[in-house]
């Protein structure tokens, strides 16, 4: 998708792992597979939409019991923290830390500053994709995609993929392009 290689393996609808160019060791316990740029179809390319209208990955959501610990682990792996915020937009107070991995954003979420931290293992919590035309993608996917609504990012819209109907356990959202 765009400049990001997506290789599906295994069965059972579980998200089993990821690879980041230049990273070979686990990040705060989060397994990382070796990035294989010799695999057919791994040459970066322009945003060519799939027939469902998806053109690239927008961001990967990583959940941690301790944002400071996990952000430091990402920094040690060579990824730069590019911003962050505290929010209650999703209910309980939480912290979001944003990092870039190539052209994909990593959104690290966990307890807000001053909230108790935990030893909860770091995990992939969600995936957000970009559709060239969100309404067309929603039409193509029919009842498999929720109704598009305003996203947190100004000028963008978002809709959730109905994972149970699709057969996946990882929360997936589809977003309109950046404006």
Each PLM stretch: what is its role?
Residues 1-82, 93, 100-179:
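Glyoxalase I/VOC metalloenzyme domain signal
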């Amino acid at each position: 998708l765009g400049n990001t290689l997506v290789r599906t393996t295994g069965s059972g609808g579980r998200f089993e792992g990821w690879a980041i160019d230049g990273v070979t060791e686990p990040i705060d316990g989060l397994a990382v597979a070796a990035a294989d740029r010799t695999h057919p179809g791994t040459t970066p390319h322009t945003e060519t939409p799939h027939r469902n209208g998806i053109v690239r990955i927008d961001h990967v959501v990583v959940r941690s019991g301790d944002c400071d610990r996990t952000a430091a682990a990402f920094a040690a792996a060579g990824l730069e923290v590019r911003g962050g915020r505290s929010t209650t937009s999703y209910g309980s107070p939480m912290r979001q830390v944003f990092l870039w991995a190539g052209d994909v954003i990593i959104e690290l979420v966990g307890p807000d500053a001053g909230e108790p931290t935990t030893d909860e293992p770091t995990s992939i919590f969600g995936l957000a994709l970009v559709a060239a035309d969100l309404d067309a993608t929603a039409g193509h996917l029919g009842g498999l995609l929720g109704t598009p609504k305003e996203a947190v990012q100004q000028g963008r819209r978002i809709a959730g993929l109905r994972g149970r109907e699709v057969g996946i356990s990882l929360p997936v959202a589809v977003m309109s392009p950046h404006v």
